[in-house]
């Protein structure tokens, strides 16, 4: 399927199924899954990055296993609002993944999601070594939660 706006995702997603959130890092792919009511995002184990074909196979397997009805992908926008090489790389990954699945994709501004995730893990007194293992999936949960909150607001006020 194609990339849709967050507003269009409500109609494009498969109803009764959770949404997945992704944080595409250079070494790992952070993953989070929503509940069926699309209220809460929960981090899942990250996927180590390899070559695209291997990444795609592992990711599509995970999305199938979780019965995801759509995918929110964190878009690393610069603080000034511009898109740099990381955003271009993220868009290219999704563009290459689209022909392999019928799931709709939506991008979500991920600015400061990793910072927020790290602060949350520090507040939970997670050791530095374990934070390194959990940071990408925690960031994916922050990304997904932001999108879920927006979807909830759209359902409450369809005009805005």
Swiss-Prot record:
The protein's matches in InterPro entries, at most eight in alphabetical order, are given as: RNaseH-like_sf, YqgF, YqgF/RNaseH-like_dom, YqgF/RNaseH-like_dom_sf
Q: Name one Pfam family in it.
A: RuvX
First-listed, main subcellular location of the protein, grouped into a coarse class: cytoplasm
Write out the function statement from the record.
Could be a nuclease involved in processing of the 5'-end of pre-16S rRNA.
Native organism: Chelativorans sp. (strain BNC1)
Q: Taxonomically, which superkingdom?
A: Bacteria
BP GO terms, sorted:
rRNA 5'-end processing
Where does it reside?
A: Cytoplasm
According to its UniProt record, which protein family does this protein belong to?
Belongs to the YqgF nuclease family.
**What is the top EC class of this enzyme, as a single word?**
hydrolase
Q: Does the keyword ATP-binding apply?
A: no
* Gene Ontology CC, one term: cytosol
Q: Which UniProt keywords apply?
A: Cytoplasm, Hydrolase, Nuclease, Ribosome biogenesis
Name listed for the protein in its UniProt record:
Putative pre-16S rRNA nuclease
The keyword Hydrolase belongs to this UniProt entry's keyword annotation: yes
Q: Name one GO molecular function term.
A: nuclease activity
Q: What is its EC number?
A: 3.1.-.-
